[in-house]
Amino acid sequence: MGELRIGKVEKYIHEKLEKKKLHFVLIDPDDTSPEVAGKLARVCEELGVDAIMVGGSTGAEGEVLDNVVRSIKDNSSLPVILFPGSHGGISRYADAIFFMSLLNSRNPFFITGAQALGAFTVKKFGIEPIPMAYIVVEPGETVGWVGDARPIPRHKPKLAAAYALAGQYLGMRLVYLEAGSGAPEPVPEEMVRVVKSVIDVPLIVGGGIKSGEQAKKLIKSGADIIVTGTAIEKAKSLEEARKRLEAIRNGVFV
């Protein structure tokens, strides 16, 4: 029987987590040109961001996605991890893919359907799959709507913890709590605390994180990896993006 090996990017994540908490930046190819993505990647690397995720809930694919991934790879040495909205969000140029299941979706397509449709493409391209439990928390924003999720109520941390633990027991090696891109508030600290207290795998928290202070509180509550996207994309200039990134990074690396 073939041995199940942990890939290079996942190993990189675990090794870094032994020393510090991590900061990933999410770039949405729908909203970011290849040129801007390349410049952002350079800034990310200079500021000590740990990886770049590429994807979005409305699902850029094909050439649009490829060009953004290639531009990031040309401008930085950071790992590029796909964060697909559906089975079309796969690029042969990426290093890894969060092979994720939206556990609290009402629609089986987002739990296992899209995954089955994308599996052979991941294998054919030789992209490293990283199994991840994806849990959408209120308000959920676009991803909650597109993914037909029943967002976890903000005042029900045990519900999120039950899903997270189920994900771990199903063999997923990361848990991601998502408040939704551009959410007015991040995932509640209490929810992060409760989820972290029951799982043994790294916890990623994303959505609505706009300041270093918010990042710091989430890290203190138990988040291992913070993901920011919209906060950077909404910046009017590269200089402003750099300032925002720096502020968030300082919150993560407390």
From Swiss-Prot:
Mg(2+) binds at residues 28, 57. The keyword Transport does not apply. Coiled coil: none annotated. Pathway: Membrane lipid metabolism; glycerophospholipid metabolism. It is an enzyme of class 2 (transferase). InterPro entries: GGGP/HepGP_synthase_sf (IPR038597), GGGP_HepGP_synthase (IPR008205), GGGP_synth (IPR010946), IGPS_HisA/HisF (IPR050064). This is Geranylgeranylglyceryl phosphate synthase.
